[in-house]
Each structure stands twice: as structure tokens, then as C-alpha cells.
Amino acid sequence: MKNEKGKPKKERKMELKSGLSRREFIVGTTAGFVTLSLGDLLLPSLGKAATPKKGGKLVYAGSYKNSKHKSAKKAKHPYYGIEIRTKNTYNQLTWVDENLNVVPEVATAWEANAGQDVWEVTIREDIQFHDGRPLTVEDVVASYNLHKDPKLGTSFAKKLVDKVEKIGPSKVRFFLKTPNSEFAWNMAEYRQGIMPAAPLEEMGLSGIGSGPFKFAKVDVGRRVIYEANEKYWGKGPYLDTLECVNLPGMDPLNGYLSGQFDVLASVDPSLIGQLQKTPKTAIDIAVAGDQILMVLPKYEGSPFMDKRIRQALSLALDREAVIRIVYGGKAGWASNDSHMAATNEDFLSKKPLRDVKKAKQLLAEAGYPNGITLPTFYYAPYVPEITSVLSVAAESVKAAGITMKIEERPMAGYRKWRVEDKEKTRKHRFAMGPVGPRNPAMNLFRMARPTYNESGYWHPGAEGDRYIALYKKAMRTGDPMARRKIYHEMQRLLQEEVPAIFLTGRRETIAFRSDVHGLKAHPQHWSLRFTEVWKS
């Protein structure tokens, strides 16, 4: 499949029960996403074209600390930096843009064989690393030998890439372990930076990449300072210095209001109203963002063994109330009980979104005519608004006779605590998991993978196994329209079986000072770029 530029999207009106006006929401017919008009988001001065000004320093509050960041030795490595936003210093073969489309970066073109398991990638020949060395095919091969290494590598490449080889001065060939018709998106993953060739155990430690900024200073666990890469191959950078602050227990909002920060890289939606009233402040809201996943463990004695109870819980949840109350009708979106992001062209809306009468009927059929009390639902504060989201959700299901107690757990060790242990002495818990927006193949694979078992033991089993078979078929299918039909079938299966519930999605929101230009919110918080950002 060759890369193609996206075609302009048409717009159509979308009716919502939240009472929002036509002007407040528009939705792309092909993408299915909701976006605010620019007039609602940006200060009037920011909408005008201006010539970028070079120089200056920008400080932003880091929002998602990298749990693997622990030592000075590895602090510049793309796997172990202070944050998972590696785009400042490293380039990947591709980039996923603000509309979740895959676009060229180090790679200029890519093409798969008919079986979708061999990909040939052409790379740019005008890129230099920070130390002046040219970026070559040999560096791409060496980088992916690291990424796919069983002990040293990163999960996406380890599971997918079998072999990588040079086939020309500007061409590399990937042999995949299994077919993947959307491999171009995998090449954009944030850890899969291209680094100078070296022994695998040494690669990445120097921090030398080909990105728009270079490492200047790292304060482990607290902050990192970057300086402009004057040899950058693309547009920009315009800033002289970029600083990310990620202090333990810091208050980003107070830091912003006191002048510490120029940018809040991830905003609590409850603060949008306050920030809109803050002088010389602009807000940008991405087309999508993370979802809140409810894992429904299915084992002997669990109420979720009964599909009717899973269906009832999904139908009882008032997702529109969450969007209206927590996200102000603007910074949230309705999930469809799959990992799919609503921005994607292959997204299949859930209909009906809520049906309390049907939920009560299903509970009665399952033997609970007077309602049901579910096990405690656990969560950790992955996003600032999570308690508010779950409080509204727990209140909403009472209308169907469902009682659901919620309990917050500390972030430290949460994922290990909520999943089954290696000895299988503990089952997966009825708990929340975060889900980032990616392409359909990555999104839908997560309900098929055994890791962390987000499907809650849905497979092995007839419908779960059928789902996996459909996924494998989609990965062998090169034609996007034929693949869409398969994706729709997979989503219909998920909406019928409800192996997991996706409560709602948030739209990644950033706030910044009005003298900051060229900055756009990104649905993947790890893909936010400062390459073309400048200060007036």
C-alpha cells in the first residue's frame, strides 16, 4: 500500500442531546470526529497568518511522566527519558499528525507486498544527526535491530518485526512476523526513534538523534532542557531553547498562572472555563484523546460471565451526561465499546448509546429484576478528571438499578496490581485502564492480545476467537475499503458481546500564552511537536 495524502473532509451537522448549538460542533463525515470552531478556541490574533520569529525560550509543564525514567545514564534514551514525548530530539520513520493520519518523516515512501508481511521503505537522504553525521540506511537498520531485540527492544517492534535489511542506498526492507496492512503507523511509535548505528547496548545513551532539538541538560526526574538543532532538515525549529518541567507533586495550573510555564501540555477539562478567562491565554482542543476502559473480568463467580449483565451496564451508562458535565460538552467524545477513536474513518457508532429500559430488561432476564450490586470498580488518576467521570457514571447507572462503588488506587504499581499475576493466583480486577488513540489495526488488536487481558478473558472462546480471526484477515487485506468492512464487523461483534466497556473519550487539551504561535493540540499526547512553534 503506498502512502497517499488525505482528501478534504466534508462536514455535516451532528445532533446532540447535550443542547449544544450547531456552531459549537461540526463533524467530519469521513472521520466521524467532533471539533470546535477556531473562533471558540483561539484568541482572534492567533488566527491571522504571521511570519515566524526566531529565538526565545519556551517552558512547558510535562503532563505524562515516563515510568521508565529513573537514572542519569539512560535519561536521554528514547525509551527512558523524563517523558514519553520523544519528538523533540528524535525522528521516527513516520509521524501521526493531528488528525491521526500517517505522514512521512525519515521515510518518504513505503509499499507492502500482496501478503502485507514484507515492506519496503525509502528514506530521506538529506538528514543529519545532531553531531553532523548523515543519517543513513545503516542507521535505520541498526535502530530497528535494537527496537526488535528480545531483551533490549520495545514491545511494538519486538512483536512485529522479524528482520530488517538494507536493499539500496536509500531503501530498507522489513520482514514482519505476521502480516500487518497498517505497518506505516507502527513506524511512528514514539520509542522507535532513529539513532546512529552502534553496539545495541550503547545505542540511545548519547541522546543523539535527528530531531529539531538537542539535549542540553537533564535533571533526572524533574526537568529537561533542549537547545535548537541548527542543522535540522525540516521547517524550524524557531525557538532557541525548549524546557520541559515535570516536578513531583507540582501544580501545573498555579505554575502557569504565576508565569512559570508558557504551555500546559494537558489540561484538566474542568479548568477550561477558568483558563478561557485568563488574560493572554489561548486554548486548543484536539479531535480526540485517551479513552477510559472498564475491564470486565469473566471467570467463575464473576457477574460479567453473563453477557446480559455486560450489555446492561453499557446501556445504563450515560456517556452524554459525562461529556456534558465533566467535559463541558466540548472536550469529550462518545466511545463505542471498542478501542477505536471516533476520529477514525473506520469508527462505527454505538446505537443506541443509552437505553435504560433495555438495561432493566436484560438484568431481569439475568435474574436481577430488582437490580444488581456490582463489585467495586477500581481506578488510578491517569487523567485529572477521572474521579469526576466515574462519579457521574456511577450515578447514571442507578437509573437501571445498578449499584457500582468506585475506589481510587495509587498510581505506583497500579497496573501490576490490577492484572493477573504470573503465578495466576489472582485474577484481573474490575478496573480502569487507559487507552490512547491510534490507527484501527493497533486499536482493535488490543482486544485480541493476551497482555494485560483488556478483554477480561474473552478468549479463548467462540466469539473471542472469531474476533481474532477477523483481525488476522484485516491484517492480510491491503485494500482500505475492504479492510473497513472487516473493521465494522469486528466493532459490531464487540458491541454485541461487550467484552469490555469504553466509558468515554477525552479530547486532549492544551493551554498556552498568546505570544506562542504554531502550537496545535494532538490527540496522542506523546506526539505533540514544538518544531514550528515560535514566540512573538
Q: How should each PLM-predicted stretch be described?
A:
Residues 1-20, 24, 31, 45-46:
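N-terminal secretory signal peptides
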Residues 512-536:
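Long beta-strand-rich cores associated with HINT superfamily self-processing modules
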Residues 79, 84, 97-101, 185-241, ...:
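Gly/Pro-rich hinge or "lid" segments in bacterial periplasmic/extracellular proteins
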Residues 230-274, 403:
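Ligand-site clamp/hinge motif
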Residues 122, 155-197, 217:
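Surface-exposed binding/hinge segments that line
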Residues 162, 399, 403-415, 443-514, ...:
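Extracytoplasmic/peripheral linker and loop segments enriched in polar/acidic and small residues
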Residues 300, 331-365, 381-389:
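Structural transition elements
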Residues 61-114, 145, 206-209:
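N-terminal lobe/hinge region of extracytoplasmic solute-binding protein
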